[in-house]
UniProtKB/Swiss-Prot annotation:
Pathway: Glycan metabolism. It comes from Arabidopsis thaliana. Keywords: Carbohydrate metabolism, Fucose metabolism, Glycoprotein, Glycosyltransferase, Membrane, Signal-anchor, Transferase, Transmembrane, Transmembrane helix. This is O-fucosyltransferase 2. It is an enzyme of class 2 (transferase). GO terms for biological process: fucose metabolic process. The gene is OFUT2. Coiled coil: none annotated.
Length: 590
């Protein structure tokens, strides 16, 4: 038994086997002892060092492998968590889109809202039937998103773009009003007297008044308080003093020109037509330059001591004009012409009711009265009935245009539309507003009277924007009574409501009211009163694809087209200072 013990001692320990890679290549059946490795080795120290290095390398390899596995495990964990969170967020968006909530009350309210909306949803026909249906769905979805996002404490009106209610360009606030600053010496008006009977509506008459003020200064003449011509289109007998404050007008401009209420008695008995002192629009070219007045009008004034301009629509050029005369033009428009208290008080009441409980409101000047529609020579989808009606109106109110259409071949209605020469219809206007992002609950004030097509066309607007109102809806019968049968005075209420609006949208940039209102908002707005000026040619190109274009594409294209009109720039040469007052004559650039 004692002789078998060495065999037990020679049995190798597990840690001395080939795990460390130091076992000699001999019999696989009987492993070497832990001392065998030194047997017959001429350099045992090198062998020990080599084994240690291999053991260290093996440890390092194990640690690297464990680290790599740990890193992969952590990355996998984060990927899993990230996937889970994204899936939850996606589900949350779906819930919000559909108006769903874990709160059963929200689900019930959403269902009730959907049922109510479906009952009210209008069936659209005509050219823009498809687009109006898409707009209705988009506005309804936006309304549900707003309502149920508010239930989750999300921001109100989050779907509206930032620049809807403010000027997108900071440069707009750098321009400040300064037309009230004077350097002119007082004028005695010794060359005679100038009278004017301005035609058109209230806004065209306003432009004529400021232009005649400049002509009076140019000719060193005294100005008689202007008179307004009775128009068979506007059918309003209002005179200057019924709309504007006469005393303020005379006093404010007294350092610039001499203003009197009537001709001296010795001149009142003159037959002005007989002596050649009556000058009509036929005799004065549009946008006549100062030289014309000095050459042709001044000699008559010096001879007869009085000149009477009849019509005087856009009969003074914007350029070239001396600096102080251009500033006088701005001073008249922005400072001297104040509405009478009766108009101001009623307009203030109108604006107060529009704002309600501090809410914003959008003013939309829908220039779509029959005179504009007939004069445009465009077609608006009314078939033969529309064509006969507009032809009849042209014969009565625009006889020269009616005669011209029979004798001369004009561009077709389709060509006029593609060139942006047709006023936007109510349908096109409401599609523009919806595409820009104004939500369904926006309060919209519509300026204008007797929209062509009547209540049927306005119904399209109210179906998409139920909070749409007019002055007739907001003011009581007794409050409107003093202005009935006075279209110019009613237009003055529209002017003030549009000028004070948080946002103003026009449908025809050639409209005098839109031009004057947009200029007023620039002059007094401090860069905080945005105006939407559609480029009708670009908008027409987009609307021509109404049968195929998708709503999201329509939105992008409309927003891009409107964004391009919002650049802040100084008045281009030859353009109206009433519409573009950002010039050194009217405003000062900080």
């Amino acid at each position: 038994m004692g002789q078998e013990r060495p065999n037990d001692e020679e049995r190798p320990e597990s840690r001395d086997l080939g795990v460390y890679g130091c076992s000699p290549p001999h019999s696989p059946r009987l492993g070497p002892t832990r001392f065998y490795v030194f047997a017959g080795d001429p350099n045992p120290k090198q062998t020990i060092k080599r084994c240690k290095r291999k053991r260290i390398q093996a440890c390092n390899d194990q640690r690297t492998a464990k680290t790599a596995i740990g890193v992969m495990a952590i990355l996998g964990f984060f990927c899993l968590v990230n996937w889970f969170m994204l899936s939850r967020l996606h589900e949350g968006r779906v819930w919000l889109r559909r108006g769903l909530s874990e709160n059963p009350k929200h689900v019930s309210a959403q269902n009730e809202e959907r049922k109510k909306f479906e009952k009210q949803k209008m069936k659209y026909n005509g050219t823009y039937g498809r687009m109006l249906s898409l707009a209705t769905d988009a506005l309804a979805e936006g309304m549900r998103d707003n309502r149920y996002c508010n239930g989750f404490d999300f921001e109100q009106n989050k779907l509206e773009t930032k620049d809807l209610w403010q000027e997108p360009k900071e440069q707009a606030s750098a321009w400040k009003p300064c037309a009230d600053q004077r350097s002119l010496t007082p004028d005695d008006g010794k060359n005679g007297y100038i009278m004017v009977t301005a035609n058109g509506g209230i806004n065209q008459q306003r432009v004529a008044v400021c232009n005649i003020v400049v002509v009076a200064r140019l000719l060193n003449a005294a100005l008689v308080i202007p008179k307004f011509m009775l128009s068979d289109v506007w059918t309003d007998a209002s005179q200057f003093g019924d709309i504007y404050q006469e005393e303020h007008f005379m006093e404010y401009l007294s350092p610039d020109i001499r203003i009197v209420k009537e001709l001296p008695k010795e001149l009142q008995s003159l037959n002005l037509e007989e002596i050649g002192s009556v000058v009509t629009d036929i005799e004065v070219m549009k946008e006549a330059k100062p030289d014309f007045y000095m050459t042709h009008i001044l000699p008559i004034l010096l001879k007869n001591r009085v000149i009477h301009f009849v019509g005087f629509g856009n009969r003074l050029a914007f350029d070239p004009l001396p600096f102080e005369l251009q500033r006088l033009r701005c001073r008249c428009n922005f400072h001297a012409l104040n509405f009478v208290p009766r108009i101001q008080e009623t307009a203030a009441l109108l604006v107060k009711r529009l704002r309600g409980s501090g809410s914003y409101y959008l003013a939309l000047h829908l220039r779509f009265e029959i005179d504009m529609v007939a004069h445009s020579l465009c077609y608006f989808g009314g078939g033969e009935t529309e064509q006969k009606e507009l032809d009849s109106y042209r014969q009565k109110h625009f006889p020269s245009l009616s005669t011209l259409t029979r004798k001369k071949k004009f561009r077709s209605a389709d060509v006029l539309r593609t060139e942006g020469l047709c006023p936007l219809t109510p349908e096109e206007a409401v599609l523009m507003l919806a595409a820009l992002g104004f939500n369904r609950e926006t309060r919209v004030f519509v300026a204008g009277a007797n929209i062509y097509g009547g209540s049927k066309r306005l119904a399209v607007l109210t179906s998409l924007y139920p909070n749409l109102v007019t002055k007739e809806k907001l003011l009581t019968e007794s409050e409107l009574q003093p202005f009935k049968n006075f279209s110019s005075q009613l237009a003055a209420l529209d002017f003030i409501a549009c000028a004070a609006a948080d946002a103003f949208a026009m449908t025809d940039s050639g409209s005098q009211l839109s031009s004057l209102v947009s200029g007023y908002r620039i002059y007094y707005g401090g860069g905080k009163l945005p105006t939407i000026r559609p480029n009708k040619r670009r908008l027409s190109d987009i609307l021509l694809k109404n049968s195929t274009i998708e709503w999201n594409v329509f939105e992008k294209r409309v927003r891009k087209a409107i964004r391009q009109t919002k650049h802040v720039f100084a008045r281009p040469n030859g353009r109206s200072v009433y519409r573009y007052p950002r010039c050194k004559e009217c405003m000062c650039h900080a």
